[in-house]
């Protein structure tokens, strides 16, 4: 059985070497056939140099250097596209998610027969103010996205090769990987994880809002349907009000001047109109970007052996006798991998 560990690097210089040490130790408990893939997402620090230095002592390390910063999600998809393992362990390199999670994730995947075991916050770190934004994000996603996103999911996950191959078939240029994880399907099992928190994050409030907008507009047409019904409701209400005013003016009394109400109505309808046009513009811009068919990342260089022509064997072949016995993992000898084009 071959195991791939995939991680991305951005401002990761303080963590690369320790991440490698922990990841390698966790992988060696499962199989000797390992590859560790670092994807440099245009990191401005020395993370790339540290990762490349590992090649001198471990030929299982591969480093994919992107030509610039493309974003966390696109970097992850690039790493997954180059993974050749029968199982693929995706995890962030900042050590907030411990690489030692690989072993319990592996045991749960084997015991449940799942295609994916993904981490979820057992309890979100930080106070209520820090967690208020994520709660609103997931509530909005549950209301507007189809399918709804699983709440409090983490990057860390263990996946079969069949699932990864299906996942990387998605070719959206504007990636929202949380939605892709969901719509790819397969049998997915959550697992509670106590995630550490180093006190800072590269996901600013602006990035979180942008992520929410991407999630909603990439996987749902509900906002457009909402606009349709909103417009219909405004038309019905305004038509009814106009009819009432005309009848009132003709049969009952003179129409009183109401400049304040007129101005408020104009501003309100103007704001709704601008909002709706902007929302439609987001959808149109996504169509525009997709029609260009640009690659979602560009690789500048790959350090280490390129094994992308090596195809993983099926999970059934990789685990002919793997099972849990009395809570302990029992595995057979790893089998050879099939070869062919991937």
Curated annotation (Swiss-Prot):
Keyword Cell membrane: yes
GO cellular component term, pick one: plasma membrane
Major subcellular location class: membrane
Membrane topology: Multi-pass membrane protein
Residue ranges that the Swiss-Prot or TrEMBL entry lists as coiled coil: none
EC number: 2.4.-.-
Keywords: Cell membrane, Glycosyltransferase, Membrane, Transferase, Transmembrane, Transmembrane helix
Compartment(s): Cell membrane
Pfam family, one: Glycos_transf_2
InterPro entries to which the protein is assigned, alphabetical: Glyco_trans_2-like, Glycosyltransferase_2, Nucleotide-diphossugar_trans
Keyword Isomerase in annotation: no
Residue intervals passing through the bilayer: 227-247, 262-282
UniProt GO MF annotations: glycosyltransferase activity
Job of this protein: May play only a redundant role in maintaining cell wall viability and bacterial virulence.
Family of this protein: Belongs to the glycosyltransferase 2 family.
Note: Was identified as a high-confidence drug target.
Official protein name in the record: Putative glycosyltransferases
Gene name for this UniProt entry: pimF
């Amino acid at each position: 059985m071959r195991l791939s560990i995939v991680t991305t690097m951005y401002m990761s210089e303080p963590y690369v070497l320790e991440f490698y040490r922990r990841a390698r130790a966790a992988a060696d408990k499962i199989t000797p056939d390992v590859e560790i893939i670092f994807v440099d997402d245009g990191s401005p620090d020395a993370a790339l140099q540290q990762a490349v230095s590992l090649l001198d002592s471990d030929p299982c390390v591969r480093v994919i250097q992107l030509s610039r910063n493309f974003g966390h999600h696109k970097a992850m998809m690039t790493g997954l596209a180059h993974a050749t393992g029968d199982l693929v362990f995706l995890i962030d390199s900042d050590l907030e998610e411990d690489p030692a999670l690989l072993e319990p994730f592996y045991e749960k995947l084997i015991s449940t027969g799942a295609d994916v075991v993904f981490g979820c916050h057992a309890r979100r770190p930080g106070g209520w103010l820090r967690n208020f934004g994520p709660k609103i994000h997931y509530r909005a996603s549950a209301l507007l996205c189809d399918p709804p996103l699983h709440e409090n999911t983490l990057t860390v996950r263990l996946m079969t090769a069949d699932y990864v191959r299906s996942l990387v078939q998605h070719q959206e240029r504007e990636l929202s990987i949380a939605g892709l994880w969901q719509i790819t399907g397969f049998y997915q099992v959550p697992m509670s994880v106590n995630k550490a928190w180093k006190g800072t994050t590269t996901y600013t409030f602006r990035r979180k809002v942008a992520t929410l907008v991407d999630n909603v507009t990439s996987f749902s047409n509900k906002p457009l349907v909402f606009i349709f019904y909103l417009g219909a409701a405004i038309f019905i209400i305004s038509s009814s009000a106009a009819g009432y005013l005309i009848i009132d003016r003709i049969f009952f009394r003179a129409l009183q001047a109401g400049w304040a109400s007129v101005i408020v109505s104009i501003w309100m309808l103007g704001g709704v109109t601008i909002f709706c046009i902007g929302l439609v513009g987001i959808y149109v811009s996504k169509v525009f970007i997709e029609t260009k068919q640009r690659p979602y990342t560009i690789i500048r260089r790959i350090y280490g052996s390129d094994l992308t022509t090596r195809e993983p064997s099926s999970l059934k072949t990789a685990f002919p006798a793997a099972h849990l016995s009395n809570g302990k993992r029992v595995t057979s000898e790893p089998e050879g991998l099939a070869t062919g084009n991937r």
